[in-house]
Amino acid sequence: MAALYRPGLRLNWHGLSPLGWPSCRSIQTLRVLSGDLGQLPTGIRDFVEHSARLCQPEGIHICDGTEAENTATLTLLEQQGLIRKLPKYNNCWLARTDPKDVARVESKTVIVTPSQRDTVPLPPGGARGQLGNWMSPADFQRAVDERFPGCMQGRTMYVLPFSMGPVGSPLSRIGVQLTDSAYVVASMRIMTRLGTPVLQALGDGDFVKCLHSVGQPLTGQGEPVSQWPCNPEKTLIGHVPDQREIISFGSGYGGNSLLGKKCFALRIASRLARDEGWLAEHMLILGITSPAGKKRYVAAAFPSACGKTNLAMMRPALPGWKVECVGDDIAWMRFDSEGRLRAINPENGFFGVAPGTSATTNPNAMATIQSNTIFTNVAETSDGGVYWEGIDQPLPPGVTVTSWLGKPWKPGDKEPCAHPNSRFCAPARQCPIMDPAWEAPEGVPIDAIIFGGRRPKGVPLVYEAFNWRHGVFVGSAMRSESTAAAEHKGKIIMHDPFAMRPFFGYNFGHYLEHWLSMEGRKGAQLPRIFHVNWFRRDEAGHFLWPGFGENARVLDWICRRLEGEDSARETPIGLVPKEGALDLSGLRAIDTTQLFSLPKDFWEQEVRDIRSYLTEQVNQDLPKEVLAELEALERRVHKM
């Protein structure tokens, strides 16, 4: 059968005979259900025709992105039993997936390059690497050959031209996704700019090729159409950065099937960024305006479950301060002609974790998801609404709950009503505090970059890096508390450098070199780098810092540091606020001594753990500048 990818060859989309494709099925026998293949740019038409020969769909639908098309897509999904209307809200829908298809599958997510070391550093002694999964071109070819021939039989192949970033922005990039999932079509219309305007902007330009199949062909054997289509045993998400291709099979869940998100916007884009001299990062972007009217833009990288969306949509507790959201998950950043680092949010929507979202933790998110939203794997209330752990809303009398598994549920039940990774997919424009410049084609100027993690002990509320090189080291050493899969293991501290550990598109050592190289750019105005930790606890296990809207007090100090205020003192790990420099007015008593303490025994162990991780996981690819920063920290901690 014809294969999408051939090892060692750039795929020839402009005529298949040189690669010796067997004839599968003439494209003329396929029904084009919507759109005109002949009007597509040559590169896209070749991509569609070859993929159709390979996957053998029943018909082809070229998406135009219109409201009428979206309505028809949602109606089709409802008729197939894949989504349910939520009458409590305006144009909101609920999808329930197969319980085996609920999250990103890191173990089945691979980067394909000729050399393993292009993708991942090689730990000493053949130890298992934790910084990505490499697959050889030959193995990947076999995997594609086993999965894709005929995989769309009985289904429609949708052609989705989409722009990551505002259409026409010099910072944006275009992709074309082929998929047999109408759920993906409806979700991608929210998460990206999708349709005819993208084709017009692309012309004959380059685009990232994205092929996705749920991996469950309908061969006329009486398969139930209401069952969530997926193929968990054969799930594979492959990235071929040299060819700018993404190939995903077997999963309908967001991170595996909405290929514009982590696959394109981080894994492929981080490689594009390295090749072209920019940055593609797992970061929120927010604008913050002081009471005096001074506005700054900040990018921040946090691992999962550390409040990235909450910070991006924060309602500041400090009077007179205003936060506006540019993006909550991904930042593409490039230096302009004047040396300013400018950032866009390449996404068009929010794909947020539902549990824990409430009017208390994130009122702006709750306002965003009242209309035009697709919910996945949350619970449903009998009055046509949604429900999840931490929604902080009492159930009205007589209202019952159906869990994400379709079973009756009541408060106090042992099992959660919503899956822990359940999601809302909502248009960004509906957020009440979207920044006026969130779609500015030139991007917004970044003044500070913040790293952070969930650290119950030892790490202070906020500190500033000494300089850019030290800041890159701080990002490389990021760690965060995570709940282990096995319950009895309790909480463990995981390394998550730059909050990018699952998303690197190339060797992390080379990624560090790329970040370090920014310092050598002529005229570059480098942002200051900070580290925050909202999650430190006292001996009794209580949080030392109230978090949420009170985090504006930390942003206030960061902004004053950017203005050159002398409000920091030097410590072995970085610059922390001087006594009284944080505005704590109106707060209950905060134990700042404990909040900013640096226990020597903790930091001695911390630097041992960081050294072990970097020397083992990055090994020979660890830049000498990062190793020098580690050694300098070791010396400073030794003198504490």
Curated annotation (Swiss-Prot):
Its cofactor is Mn(2+). The keyword Metal-binding applies. It catalyses: oxaloacetate + GTP = phosphoenolpyruvate + GDP + CO2. Its EC number is 4.1.1.32. The modification N6-acetyllysine is found at K88. The keyword Phosphoprotein applies. One of its GO terms (molecular function) is phosphoenolpyruvate carboxykinase (GTP) activity. Belongs to the phosphoenolpyruvate carboxykinase [GTP] family. In eukaryotes there are two isozymes: a cytoplasmic one and a mitochondrial one. This is Phosphoenolpyruvate carboxykinase [GTP], mitochondrial. It comes from Homo sapiens (Human).
